[in-house]
Structures are given as structure tokens and as C-alpha cells.
Amino acid sequence: MLTLIQGKKIVNYLRSRLAFEYNGQLIKILSKNIVAVGSLRREEKMLNDVDLLIIVPEKKCLKHVLPNIRIKGLSFSVKVCGERKCVLFIEWEKKTYQLDLFTALAEEKPYAIFHFTGPVSYLIRIRAALKKKNYKLNQYGLFKNQTLVPLKITTEKELIKELGFTYRIPKKRL
């Protein structure tokens, strides 16, 4: 367990130190492409882990980012890692914490932020209401009859309003 303040410190540290190796070169992940999600974004007082979403510009980049993740100046071990999710254990101030990294394409960003911010109970209610209208919402997009429904949105707030719900800041979601 770590406090919200510790979680924010870890995220601030990571924003300037996340990179991935590609063709023998270290590629820095820009701070603007790193989004805190999960209990940290909901500003819960105590956190089980730190969740970060990394926005990737192109689909072909997915296979390179997480499997080749590097953190400058921080000791870590990989528990499990794939193209879309990586679970790490990081050493921070003489303690070990879990860091969950997720990836999303730029066009998936609002959906992924909503999905990974949660909480699960809130997502279930939204998805149940959408299911009654034959829609499916996940971290990749909004679908009707298994076909992606293109929405002209760029933020999570726009997504919620487009779906016909009242936007609640993450801290107020139950």
C-alpha cells in the first residue's frame, strides 16, 4: 500500500524517465503521452498500485513499447508483460510497489482513460445502460453490433456526454 502523495511522486518521477528500446536505441516516452489512471486518478487516499496509461501514436508501435520498457534510474522487475499491459515491481524509497502500465492508440485515448480510471462498479452501470441500447463500450472504443461507432471526441468528458450521461470527475465516481 502507498499513499496518494507517494503515488503522485512516483508518477512525477516516471514522467521524465519512461522509455523503450527499439533497434538498439532508447526512445523516450513523452510526458504528454503518460496518463495516471486507476485509484491514483480517482485520488483515493491509499493505493494498492500505480496505474499508468501510455498513449502510442501507431498500431505498429504497440509491440515495441511495453515489452521493451525501460525506467531511467529506477530498479524494477517484470511480473508479466505484453503489448497492451505490463505489470512491474519498482523499488521506490526502499520499498517495492506494483506499477501497472497499459497502452492505447491515440484514437482509443478517451475510451482507455475512462476504462482504466474506473472504478469497476461505475463502469458496470454505464455499460449495462449502453447494453440495453445494443452498444458495447470498452477501452478500445464504442461498438454497435460489433462495429466500431466513430465518435468525434478527444476527451473522456466528451465521451461521457456523447453517450448521454452526466460527466463525473473521477474522484466522485462510485
Swiss-Prot record:
<dbReference type="InterPro" id="IPR019843">
    <property type="entry name" value="DNA_pol-X_BS"/>
</dbReference>
<keyword id="KW-0479">Metal-binding</keyword>
<protein>
    <recommendedName>
        <fullName>Repair DNA polymerase X</fullName>
        <ecNumber>2.7.7.7</ecNumber>
    </recommendedName>
</protein>
<keyword id="KW-1015">Disulfide bond</keyword>
<feature type="binding site">
    <location>
        <position position="100"/>
    </location>
    <ligand>
        <name>Mg(2+)</name>
    </ligand>
</feature>
<keyword id="KW-0946">Virion</keyword>
<dbReference type="InterPro" id="IPR022312">
    <property type="entry name" value="DNA_pol_X"/>
</dbReference>
<dbReference type="GO" id="GO:0003677">
    <property type="term" value="F:DNA binding"/>
</dbReference>
<dbReference type="GO" id="GO:0044423">
    <property type="term" value="C:virion component"/>
</dbReference>
<dbReference type="Pfam" id="PF14791">
    <property type="entry name" value="DNA_pol_B_thumb"/>
</dbReference>
<feature type="binding site">
    <location>
        <position position="49"/>
    </location>
    <ligand>
        <name>Mg(2+)</name>
    </ligand>
</feature>
<keyword id="KW-0460">Magnesium</keyword>
<dbReference type="GO" id="GO:0046872">
    <property type="term" value="F:metal ion binding"/>
</dbReference>
<keyword id="KW-0808">Transferase</keyword>
<dbReference type="InterPro" id="IPR037160">
    <property type="entry name" value="DNA_Pol_thumb_sf"/>
</dbReference>
<dbReference type="Pfam" id="PF01909">
    <property type="entry name" value="NTP_transf_2"/>
</dbReference>
<feature type="binding site">
    <location>
        <position position="51"/>
    </location>
    <ligand>
        <name>Mg(2+)</name>
    </ligand>
</feature>
<keyword id="KW-0239">DNA-directed DNA polymerase</keyword>
<feature type="region of interest" description="Involved in ssDNA binding">
    <location>
        <begin position="42"/>
        <end position="51"/>
    </location>
</feature>
<comment type="similarity">
    <text>Belongs to the DNA polymerase type-X family.</text>
</comment>
<keyword id="KW-0238">DNA-binding</keyword>
<keyword id="KW-0227">DNA damage</keyword>
<dbReference type="InterPro" id="IPR043519">
    <property type="entry name" value="NT_sf"/>
</dbReference>
<comment type="function">
    <text>Error-prone polymerase lacking a proofreading 3'-5' exonuclease which catalyzes the gap-filling reaction during the DNA repair process. Specifically binds intermediates in the single-nucleotide base-excision repair process. Also catalyzes DNA polymerization with low nucleotide-insertion fidelity. Probably acts as a strategic DNA mutase, which gives rise to a rapid emergence of variants. Generates mismatched G-G pairs, in that case, the polymerase first binds the deoxynucleotide followed by mismatch formation.</text>
</comment>
<keyword id="KW-0234">DNA repair</keyword>
<feature type="site" description="Stabilizes dGTP in a syn conformation to overcome the Watson-Crick base pairing constraint">
    <location>
        <position position="115"/>
    </location>
</feature>
<dbReference type="InterPro" id="IPR029398">
    <property type="entry name" value="PolB_thumb"/>
</dbReference>
<dbReference type="InterPro" id="IPR002934">
    <property type="entry name" value="Polymerase_NTP_transf_dom"/>
</dbReference>
<keyword id="KW-0548">Nucleotidyltransferase</keyword>
<feature type="disulfide bond">
    <location>
        <begin position="81"/>
        <end position="86"/>
    </location>
</feature>
<dbReference type="GO" id="GO:0006303">
    <property type="term" value="P:double-strand break repair via nonhomologous end joining"/>
</dbReference>
<dbReference type="GO" id="GO:0003887">
    <property type="term" value="F:DNA-directed DNA polymerase activity"/>
</dbReference>
